């Protein structure tokens, strides 16, 4: 393979627009057989995923009852979609600079777009890393 062909194999990097959702958020893991609690479904953004191994819940931190512990508080960044299913490299383009900067993430995909949660202590570094590669932070929408 020539150098020119190797460059052709490089995934396309997208310049994306994103916004920070009002937060903070919590991520919790419950037993796989646990019922979905009412508190998990409240708010403008929540994600509930059940597998054979667990029930994962992402929801506003203020929704958690005292008996439920989440070790971190997270910010939630929403990529401005929608993105067609045929478009490749969208999430990679967004999380690669975060990975390069040592920022841990928790990603959620929906039908229209992607959401990336970042621990609050990494928020400033994360936004800076994203902007340095050309991603654009849009004004926050409160609703």
Regions found by a protein language model. Name each.
Residues 101-116, 122, 143:
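A cross-kingdom feature marking solvent-exposed beta-strand/loop segments within repeated
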Residues 1-97, 101, 125-143:
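Regulatory modules associated with amino-acid/nitrogen control
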Residues 54-59, 113-119:
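A generic structural motif
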């Amino acid at each position: 393979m020539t150098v020119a062909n190797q460059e052709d194999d490089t995934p396309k990097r997208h310049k994306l627009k994103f916004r920070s959702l009002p937060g903070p958020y919590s991520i919790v893991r419950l037993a796989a057989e646990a019922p979905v609690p009412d508190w998990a479904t409240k708010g403008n953004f929540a994600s509930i995923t059940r597998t054979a191994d667990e029930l994962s819940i992402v929801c506003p931190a203020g929704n958690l009852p005292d008996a439920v512990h989440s070790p971190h508080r997270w910010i939630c960044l929403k990529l401005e979609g929608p993105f067609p299913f045929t478009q490749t490299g969208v999430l990679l383009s967004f999380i690669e600079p975060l990975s390069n900067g040592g920022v841990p993430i928790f990603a959620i995909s929906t039908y229209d777009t992607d959401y990336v949660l970042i621990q609050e202590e990494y928020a400033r570094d994360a936004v800076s890393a994203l902007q340095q590669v050309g991603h654009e932070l849009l004004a926050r929408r409160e609703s």
